[in-house]
Regions:
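Long, structured ligand/cofactor-binding scaffold of large enzymes
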Residues: 60-62
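Noncatalytic scaffold domains of N-terminal-nucleophile
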Residues: 21-56, 68-69, 73-233, 238-240, ...
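Bacterial N-terminal signal peptides that target proteins for export
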Residues: 1-6
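Hydrophobic h-region of N-terminal signal peptides that target proteins for export
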Residues: 9-18
Length: 262
């Protein structure tokens, strides 16, 4: 987990229609100057995220008659594929929404510290903060909340089933997508330190002995399978099934604290 993901949904509870010929999204993502300080206005609905592919997923959901929460959850799962730096299902976040009756609700599904976490677990033997422990080790991982938060929001405020809104993310994971500047830069800057230590991650995000570059295709078959399980069985597939077993085993093997009980 590199950073947290925050997804906001506005004006939930009503269906949106999108203009027949909306302007095409800019072919850039965050970190590129061209997508900064260029406001866009819309009357019926709007989707914004850190990644253009994920944003298009949300727009498609609105076009199909979904509401803002349907779109937000679809975007959240799409970001789990297209923005692995922060949008992954191993993380957590927040959702703030305003229903058509004017009520504002906040859903907190931020990661929680595992039960075995202690106050001093990020200190070295001399009692000094150890940034590697707190940022890149298995100790740095909190119990994920994204899958539970998405499901809660969709159940209470959405209009579409999970199997439908998660489907675009599954397709992106299985078929892959072209790595953009932002992802390539982050894989080089952040991933070069962490990813080589984990063979499974290296097999996904590296090619020919180095991080994927802009223009390479990123395919995540295993993530697609995990998302398919969630689509079929809901959040229990993540927190109680084989996925939970694999997370717990990985943590135990590498000194992490998350257990299946968490």
């Amino acid at each position: 987990i590199w950073r947290q993901v925050v997804i906001a949904a506005l004006l939930a509870g009503g269906s949106f229609t999108v203009a027949a010929n909306p302007p095409p999204p800019p072919p850039v993502s965050y970190g590129v100057e061209e997508d900064v300080f260029h406001p866009v206005r819309a009357r019926q609905g709007m989707v914004a995220s850190v990644d253009a592919l994920a944003t298009r997923v949300g727009v498609d959901i609105l076009r199909q008659g979904g509401n803002a929460v349907d779109a937000a959850v679809a975007v959240g799962y799409a970001l789990a594929v297209t923005h692995p730096q922060a949008g992954n299902i191993g993380g957590g976040g927040f959702m703030m929404l305003r229903t058509k009756d004017g009520k504002t609700t906040a859903i907190d599904f931020r990661e929680m510290a595992p039960e075995q976490a202690t106050r001093d677990m990020f200190l070295d033997d001399q009692g000094n903060p150890d940034s590697k422990k707190s940022l890149t080790s298995h100790l740095a991982s909190g119990t994920p909340g994204s899958v539970a938060g998405f499901s809660l929001a969709l159940e209470k405020y959405g209009t579409m089933p999970l199997n439908k809104v998660i489907r675009p993310a599954i397709k992106l994971a299985e078929e892959g997508f072209i790595v953009n500047d932002a992802l390539a830069d982050d894989l080089k800057t952040y991933g070069s330190e962490v990813i080589p230590q984990h063979e499974n991650s290296k097999a996904i995000f590296w090619k020919n002995g180095e991080p994927l570059k802009k223009g390479d295709r990123l395919v995540q078959k295993n993530l697609g399978k995990s998302l398919e399980l969630i689509a079929e069985r809901g959040p229990d597939a993540f927190y109680k099934g084989a996925i939970a077993d694999q997370i717990a085993n990985e943590m135990k093997k590498h000194g992490g604290l998350i257990t299946k009980a968490d």
